[in-house]
Structure formats: structure tokens, C-alpha cells
């Protein structure tokens, strides 16, 4: 289903539109111990992400993007520094949604069952809710199909629906469209924009694709040489046409900044 036809409001179909969270990264340093000694990935990095914003972390392969995301996800411990999350309710533990390069679906479960699985200890989460999250990503005719019956793009939509279904104030996405062909990836970018705008979440999105970062984000952080060396606000109205003069002008500015580290 084309995202251009998917303008459903989350609340109107019974999907909760919860509070977005802020991310505070303070003086973050990460080193790995190797046989050759300490390998510095990045050092003394600080940035803040406002609630409800869409921020991309852009960098070349090996720049430390996934390491940064894993620290923010609490999968890795930093060498020093800290990451904090905040919402309007200080007593609420901030849940994090995750979307990976591969959707990691269980092939023996239907789409609905794959979503229900992450709610197995929540008696209030019903099949109807699982179906509504699938509706949000254009899979209303596929509830009881199995992942192997879907295309790669459709499987990734299930991964997105599953991540949003836990109502996370913060969504972390690690190059989720990098394994897809460009036509399918573009369809999913549009779907993601619709869902993000409907559900009011903070998104931190890792990519190596400059055009993708501009199309999606409010702000672009550029990681390289162990530091954040670029921090660009994206001043373009939504929806964004990647062939517009405004987009192409800003893309050139972003390219100049991105490759300035090589000068």
C-alpha cells in the first residue's frame, strides 16, 4: 500500500499516540581493548535531541555509528560519559523501540503473532491492537500471513509496526532500509514519515546515505574521526521532493560538510 494513500491518524484507529522523549548524550567516550592496545572509537561527544524530533546520525562505514546506537540502546557500556532519557512523566521508565537492518521476524509465527510476542506479558495488548499497528504500515490484508510469504520491504514494515507497538517515547533505527532496493526503500521512508508524524515519537536514525538523511530528518549529526564534526538543521518543508531545487541545494551543502573531514 502506498504511503501516499495512508493518512490514517493513530488515535482515530485506536493506536496510542504517547509522549515523545528527549535524549541527552554527555561527554561520551568509547574505547575497545584490542591485542594492539586501546582502540578509540569516539571521544567526549555531547548532544541533545528534542522530544518529537527526527535526528539522523550520518557517517561512513567504521565511523562508530552502530557503536553509538548500541550505547544509547544500553547494549554497550561507554568508557566514560552518560546517556539520559526524559519524558514529561519523570516517574515513567523510558521504553526504547528498535528497528534493525533485518526485521528479525520469527518465520513460524504470523505477522500478528510476531507483534503479539513482544507483548506476551501485557494482558491489555490484544490482537486488535496488533492489527491496527499493521494497518498503520499498510499491511491490513496480511495479518495471518507468515514472513516468508512477504517481500523484504513488507517484512521491514512488520518490524517497524512491532517497534512502534510498544509505544516507545524514543525510536532507535539502525540503517533499516539499507538492504532494500531503492524503490522499496523510498516507499518505506514515506511510510515511516507518516507513522512518525501520526504517533509523536522521537526518532534517532543511523544511516550512511546523505539523501536519505535529508529526506527524513529535522537535523543531521555527522560522525567521523572520533567526533561529531557536522550538525546541520534541515530547513526544508515536508513532504520533501528529492528532485526539487531546494533539496538539491541543501544536499550539496550537506555533501560539502560531510566530506570536509577529508580536507
Which residues make up each language-model segment?
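Helix-to-loop junction immediately C-terminal to a conserved catalytic motif
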Residues: 73
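ABC-type ATPase nucleotide-binding domains, specifically the catalytic core motifs of the NBD
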Residues: 33-35, 77, 113-128, 136
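The feature captures the beta-strand-to-loop junction immediately N-terminal to the Walker
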Residues: 58-60
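Hydrophobic anchor residue at the start of the ABC signature
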Residues: 160
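Conserved ABC transporter NBD signature motif
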Residues: 81-94
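Conserved signature/switch motifs of ABC ATPase nucleotide-binding domains
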Residues: 145-148, 166
Amino acid at each position: 500500500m502506498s504511503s501516499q494513500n495512508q493518512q490514517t491518524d493513530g488515535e482515530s484507529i485506536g493506536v496510542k499516540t504517547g509522549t515523545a522523549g528527549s535524549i541527552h548524550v554527555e561527554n561520551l567516550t568509547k574505547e575497545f581493548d584490542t591485542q594492539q592496545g586501546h582502540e578509540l572509537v569516539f571521544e567526549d561527544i555531547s548532544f541533545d535531541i528534542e522530544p518529537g524530533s527526527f535526528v539522523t546520525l550520518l557517517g561512513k562505514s567504521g565511523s562508530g555509528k552502530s557503536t553509538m546506537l548500541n550505547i544509547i540502546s544500553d547494549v554497550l557500556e561507554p568508557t566514560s560519559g552518560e546517556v539520559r532519557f526524559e519524558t514529561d512523566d519523570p516517574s515513567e521508565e523510558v521504553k526504547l523501540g528498535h528497528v534493525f537492518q533485518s526485521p528479525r521476524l520469527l518465520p513460524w509465527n504470523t505477522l500478528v503473532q510476531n507483534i503479539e510476542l513482544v507483548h506476551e506479558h501485557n494482558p491489555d495488548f490484544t490482537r486488535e491492537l496488533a492489527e491496527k499497528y499493521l494497518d498503520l504500515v499498510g499491511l491490513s490484508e496480511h495479518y495471518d500471513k507468515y514472513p516468508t510469504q512477504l517481500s523484504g520491504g513488507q517484512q521491514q514494515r512488520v518490524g517497524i509496526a512491532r517497534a512502534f507497538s510498544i509505544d516507545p517515547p524514543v525510536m532507535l533505527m539502525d540503517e533499516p532500509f539499507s538492504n532494500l532496493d531503492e524503490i522499496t526503500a523510498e516507499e518505506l521512508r514515506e511510510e515511516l514519515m507518516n507513522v512518525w508524524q501520526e504517533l509523536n515519537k522521537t526518532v534517532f536514525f543511523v544511516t550512511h546515505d546523505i539523501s536519505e538523511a535529508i529526506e527524513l530528518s529535522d537535523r543531521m549529526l555527522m560522525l567521523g574521526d572520533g567526533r561529531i564534526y557536522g550538525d546541520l538543521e534541515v530547513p526544508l518543508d515536508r513532504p520533501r521532493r528529492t528532485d526539487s531545487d531546494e533539496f538539491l541545494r541543501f544536499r550539496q551543502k550537506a555533501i560539502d560538510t560531510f566530506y570536509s573531514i577529508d580536507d
